[in-house]
Amino acid sequence: MSPATILVLAMSMSVDAFAVSVGRGAALGRPRLSEALRTGAVFGAVEAATPLIGWAAGMVASSYLEAIDHWIAFGLLAGVGLHMLVAAFSRRDEEADDTPRGRSIWVLLATALGTSIDAMAVGVSLAFLNVNIVVVALAIGAMSFLMSSGGMLVGRMVGQKFGRLAEVVAGVALCGLGLAILIEHLSA
């Protein structure tokens, strides 16, 4: 696999993480740089690990994963999206969600897992190609780290101007992404 192909693959696998991070940055209002880096680290680690897991599973688990991956992605993304919508509409004022629950590592991890299901499927497909899976996984992880950290900072700027609206849009986008994954797999 050429370096250009690896770069395109890494960017493609990172787009969902970027979009979610923009929404997260907007929802949190004024996330600190350390929080943006933490978000990037979690997304990067999960996005790097899932193609490795998929690759290792290869042919053995592909039929099992293929049968349920869309339900897992839908459940995680829709759950996090609904959580964001409820949080946006339950606030009485325009303050950001700075509560411990809003900054929960578990919410962040669930979101990262939801956006990385496709990377696991890519990992399964890479098992049939002559690629260095470690290089590919590290590229995906590094790109996800950069795009997620940057997305949090972009979301911070958007959130200061649009606050609740940005959180609603992000929640709807997550629910829509989960639904699109489900529909795509059910109609195939």
UniProtKB/Swiss-Prot annotation:
Supply one GO CC term from the record: plasma membrane
Compartments it resides in: Cell inner membrane
Keyword Cell inner membrane belongs to the record: yes
In Pfam terms, one family for this protein is Mntp
Which keywords accompany this UniProt record? Cell inner membrane, Cell membrane, Ion transport, Manganese, Membrane, Transmembrane, Transmembrane helix, Transport
Presence of the UniProt keyword Transmembrane in the record? yes
Gene Ontology molecular-function annotations: manganese ion transmembrane transporter activity
Q: Which domain of life is it from?
A: Bacteria
Report the transmembrane regions from the record: 3-23, 41-61, 70-90, 104-124, 126-146, 168-188
Its membrane topology, per UniProt?
Multi-pass membrane protein
Quick one: where is this thing mainly located?
Answer: membrane
Q: Name the family.
A: Belongs to the MntP (TC 9.B.29) family.
This molecule's function is given as: Probably functions as a manganese efflux pump.
Would you tell me the protein name for this molecule? Answer: Putative manganese efflux pump MntP
According to its UniProt entry, this protein's organism is Xanthobacter autotrophicus (strain ATCC BAA-1158 / Py2)
Gene responsible for this protein: mntP
